[in-house]
Regions:
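Active-site groove signature of glycoside hydrolases
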Residues: 121-140, 216-217, 223
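Catalytic beta/alpha-barrel core
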Residues: 43-44, 62-68, 110-116, 131-144, ...
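Alpha-helical scaffold elements lining the catalytic groove of polysaccharide deacetylases
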Residues: 101-125, 142-147, 174-215
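Solvent-exposed loop/turn segments at secondary-structure junctions
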Residues: 47-49, 69-71, 92-96, 138-142, ...
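C-terminal domain-boundary segment and adjacent tail
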Residues: 155-169, 174, 226-261
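Active-site beta->alpha N-cap acidic-glycine motif
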Residues: 25-104
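Hydrophobic faces of well-ordered beta-strands that scaffold small-molecule active sites
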Residues: 40-44, 61-65, 84-90, 131-135, ...
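Terminal interaction modules at protein C-ends
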Residues: 1-37
């Protein structure tokens, strides 16, 4: 068949009478050099004031939004009603807590498994349109296997993946996800420091890297921090991706998925 596709038809029956037909197919492989579809899933990180400065993006994008804090329920509801997928940023214990504090409702390593799972489940259920859970800080908590196990058991039960933002060097999240069968991803490209630069040149360079990654691997998850610099730059970035043959798609079409228990 085309590109080496193979189809085998088996006739099953009694004697010379066929009662069933089984068709087994193996899709062909792309020809050498054949272009694969390139996709970018754009995730914007910011609060409601930040997102209000984003205009004229003619493409889907997800929003990494905090799970707690003043007005978070309204913000999550507004995002969902606007058609945006949500990456729920759950505050987790960082190093040097409480001097460094991600905010109210922070999940702590000292909490029992029951409390961690209960609080996390409540946070997820408060928001509609949640397609993944991410860490808000959490450099200390993500190094603790018992803590991460509690989080992963909850996410596996909810059928949600974990999107790990800025992993700490000693974080156990990635290897533990593999052992527990939990869907795990990290942004392929994160435009955070670049979004705080003095000019858009670092943003342009990182976006070029994201486009190249999408072409090479078929897809890229790209996180962009919304700032006064990055917000007005985003529409031109989306147009540049389209001109380069990259389609922006919803995050749910790119991120790995977990199966509910």
């Amino acid at each position: 068949g085309e590109a080496g596709a193979l189809t085998v038809t088996l006739l099953v029956g009694v004697g010379k009478t066929a009662t069933h037909e089984v068709v087994i197919t193996r899709p062909g492989r792309p020809h050498e050099g054949e272009a694969r579809p390139a996709r970018i899933a754009l995730v914007l990180q910011g609060d409601d004031a930040d997102l209000a400065t984003v205009h004229d993006i003619d493409a889907p994008f997800a929003v990494a939004a905090p799970a707690t804090g003043d007005g978070h329920e309204r913000f999550l509801r507004d995002l969902h009603h606007a058609g945006h997928e949500i990456v729920l940023m759950v505050p987790m214990e960082p190093e040097n807590y409480p001097r460094v504090n991600p905010g109210p409702g922070t999940l702590l390593v000292s909490m029992s498994e029951g409390r961690i799972r209960g609080e996390l489940t409540r946070m997820v259920r408060e928001g509609e349109g949640v397609v993944a859970v991410a860490n808000l800080l959490g450099s200390f908590a993500t190094q603790d296997e018992s803590f991460v196990t509690s989080v992963y058991r909850t996410l596996k039960g909810l059928g949600l993946p974990f999107l790990h933002l800025t992993p700490a060097p000693r974080a156990v999240c990635k290897p533990l996800a593999s052992r527990m069968g939990v869907a795990y991803d990290e942004p392929d490209v994160a435009l955070v420091d670049e979004a705080r630069a003095k000019t858009t040149e670092p943003l342009e360079a990182a976006w070029t890297t994201a486009i190249a990654h999408a072409h090479k691997h078929g897809a890229a998850i790209v996180l962009v921090r919304v700032t006064p610099l990055s917000a007005p730059w985003l529409p031109s970035a989306v147009k540049a991706a389209s001109a380069a043959g990259v389609t922006l798609v919803p995050l749910s079409g790119v991120i790995h998925h977990a199966s509910p228990l």
